[in-house]
């Protein structure tokens, strides 16, 4: 797995297949003119993969990586210089294309869904820096992959939007859910993005979740921008 970092006024941000959730303020505030990519050469790295889930864990100051292609269920953390494989007693089942975001209200990283060994998943897990805990909310979003998920600082909840489920009709989803640390709640906004599988990031500067683009049901791609919050 290739690892790079963006160097911005003394702060670094990790880059891999996807990063979602809260990003350190120093990275958010940096300008493109001062940022550079620097390839890292850690002594140990996770095995090569794609479609891993990754988010910044502000409680521990590390980036957390889980799973990916190849039926992987390993957990790794990156502290800015070193990859460390974690060995929790319990872990989520192997999966790829899961959603992950840091929940600042609870100080945990939230993982949802993805594609498992043979089917789509709709389970919810939280990581507290040392332990994975499966959550068992009474209601959950349906199983999916390619979901957009990010933390909304205004409401103190993790926001989930859309994704792809090959076994439902329609396959592309356009629903909005929020996670408050114990409960998933389906939202019914008057206006919302059209169904898609997308990426989303939290914008702490404005207190909104920003969503851009994604794949459309007709095989094309979107180039629109939406905000939530």
Model regions: which residues?
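Kelch-like beta-propeller repeat domains
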Residues: 3-7, 27-229
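Sec-dependent N-terminal signal peptides
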Residues: 5-15
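C-terminal segment of classical bacterial N-terminal signal peptides
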Residues: 17-26
């Amino acid at each position: 797995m290739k690892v790079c970092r963006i160097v911005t006024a003394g702060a670094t941000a990790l880059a891999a297949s996807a990063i979602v959730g809260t990003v350190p303020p120093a990275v958010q505030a940096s300008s493109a003119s001062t940022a550079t990519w620097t390839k890292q050469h850690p002594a140990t790295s996770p095995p090569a993969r794609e479609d891993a889930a990754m988010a910044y864990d502000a409680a521990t100051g590390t980036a957390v990586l889980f799973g990916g292609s190849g039926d992987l269920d390993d957990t790794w953390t990156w502290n800015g210089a070193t990859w460390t494989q974690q060995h929790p007693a319990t872990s989520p089942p192997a999966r790829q294309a899961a959603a992950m975001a840091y929940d600042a209200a609870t100080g945990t990283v939230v993982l949802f869904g993805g594609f498992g060994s043979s089917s789509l998943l709709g389970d919810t897990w939280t990581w507290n820096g040392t332990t994975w805990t499966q959550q068992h909310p009474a209601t959950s979003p349906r199983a999916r992959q390619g979901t957009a998920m990010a933390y909304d600082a205004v409401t103190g909840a993790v926001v989930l939007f859309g994704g792809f489920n090959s076994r439902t009709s329609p396959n592309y989803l356009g629903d909005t859910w929020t996670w408050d640390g114990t409960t998933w709640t389906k939202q019914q906004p008057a206006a919302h993005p059209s169904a898609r599988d997308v990426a989303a990031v939290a914008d702490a500067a404005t207190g909104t979740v920003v969503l851009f683009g994604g794949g459309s049901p007709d095989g094309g791609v979107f180039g629109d921008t939406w905000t939530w919050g």
